[in-house]
């Protein structure tokens, strides 16, 4: 199976990612290469970047030759690729709406994936990262959600629902 290394910088987020299934946790506010190597790993096979690309060079250093990095986040930051090239490592972007926006031949797969994942969630085999439902969509709750995100201490997904 996979060995999952998550990042967290506070005790409550460390505990949270372990509850979600992380085998190891490294602090993203400290040098991560050294922390991963202290776990006995020179390189890792796969890296998923879920929030921003500030740690791009760390990811490139840690990815194994012929490994893969995936990101869901756009960036305006520089992304030097020379080290990726010499490692023959790959970068993959994931965007939820690619299939429907471009009407790809496999567009039905989005439906299939969402159906599968919702079934796994309903069966309790997958936990979501939903952490807080703040109430109806209005100016007040939007400001409150945005303020929480701006603190840099939010964890998981924050949801506004209803009107």
Set out the residue ranges of the language-model regions.
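Glycine-centered, small-residue-biased loops immediately flanking beta-strands
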Residues: 2, 67, 89
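C-terminal capping/lid region of NAD(P)-dependent oxidoreductase domains
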Residues: 122-132, 143-163
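C-terminal substrate-binding/catalytic core of Rossmann-like NAD(P)-dependent dehydrogenases/reductases
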Residues: 83-134
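Helix-to-beta-strand junctions that scaffold the AdoMet/dcAdoMet cofactor pocket
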Residues: 63-64
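A general structural signal for well-ordered alpha-helical segments in protein cores
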Residues: 56, 113-115, 142
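Terminal peptide-recognition signature
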Residues: 17, 47, 91, 117, ...
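Adenosine-nucleotide cofactor-binding segment
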Residues: 1-56
């Amino acid at each position: 199976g996979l060995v999952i290394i998550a990042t967290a910088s506070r005790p409550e987020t460390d505990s949270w990612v372990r509850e979600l299934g992380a085998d190891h946790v490294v602090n993203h506010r400290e040098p991560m290469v050294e922390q991963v190597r202290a776990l006995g790993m020179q390189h890792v096979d796969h890296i998923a970047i879920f929030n921003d690309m500030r740690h791009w060079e760390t990811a490139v250093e840690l990815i194994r030759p012929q490994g893969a990095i995936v990101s869901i986040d756009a960036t305006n930051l520089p992304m030097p690729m020379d080290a990726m090239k010499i490692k023959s490592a790959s970068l993959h972007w994931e965007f939820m709406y690619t299939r429907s926006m471009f009407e790809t031949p496999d567009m039905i797969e989005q439906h299939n994936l969402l159906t599968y994942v919702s079934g796994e969630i309903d069966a309790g085999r997958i936990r979501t990262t939903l952490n807080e439902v703040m109430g109806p969509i209005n100016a007040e709750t939007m400001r409150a959600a945005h303020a929480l995100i701006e603190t840099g201490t939010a964890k998981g997904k924050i949801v506004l629902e209803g009107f």
